[in-house]
């Protein structure tokens, strides 16, 4: 018969007498951030030819859309994006295409919010601009939208949202205050071969900010 075992635990953690600890993602983040309302939003940034977002430190206006940041999305709002930070959703086009389209319509930077839970690591190797481009989580995107003002057409249809953010040049902390922790994607899970529930307990092990042991002095 085929082996139908689905557990991902290995030896010796799957042994009955072993105490196995699962990993939960940390309920917060540490990094460069911007502030909207009373929340510090820590963003994810990958370095290619794009400048760091912190080079725009200070108060900045932003334009938030519910769309994917396609060329036609930015064209539809005319001059509204000029000199502001563009915020759009992940999906339908590559990350660098979203950022380039936004910059072509006057944006000084692009923030892309995830369309599902989790953090996005983006490839901007094909990006030809130097304007910053970063990503944030889906929940942080919803927070930014919630604290923005809708701009409508003459029929009351929302075209986009606008607001202000304070960009920091320093590291900071954002605490999520979630109702419960989420199991890390890399964590083992069971049952084990003997149908015992493994791991036995869970503790924070993902998204932990700590010293870099490869660098002298941390």
What name fits each language-model region?
Residues 1-199, 203, 211-213:
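Structured lumen-facing ectodomains of secretory-pathway proteins
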């Amino acid at each position: 018969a085929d082996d139908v075992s689905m557990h991902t635990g290995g030896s010796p953690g799957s042994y009955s007498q072993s105490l196995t600890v699962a990993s939960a993602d940390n309920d917060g983040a540490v990094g460069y951030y911007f502030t909207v309302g009373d929340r510090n939003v820590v963003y994810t940034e990958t370095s290619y030819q794009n400048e760091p977002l912190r080079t725009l430190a200070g108060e900045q206006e932003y334009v938030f859309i519910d769309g994917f940041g396609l060329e036609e999305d930015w064209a539809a709002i005319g001059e509204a994006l000029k000199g502001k930070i563009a915020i759009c959703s992940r999906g339908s086009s590559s990350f660098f295409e979203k950022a380039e389209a936004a910059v072509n319509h006057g944006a000084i930077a692009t923030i892309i919010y995830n369309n599902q839970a989790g953090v996005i690591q983006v490839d901007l190797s094909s990006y030809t601009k130097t304007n910053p481009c970063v990503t944030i989580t889906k929940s942080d995107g919803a927070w930014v939208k919630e604290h923005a003002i809708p701009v409508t057409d003459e029929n009351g249809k929302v075209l986009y949202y606008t607001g202000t953010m304070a960009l920091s040049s320093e590291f900071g902390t954002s605490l999520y205050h979630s109702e419960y922790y989420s199991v890390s994607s890399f964590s083992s899970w069971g049952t084990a071969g003997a149908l015992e529930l493994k791991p036995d307990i869970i503790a924070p092990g993902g998204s932990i900010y700590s010293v870099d042991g490869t660098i002298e002095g941390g």
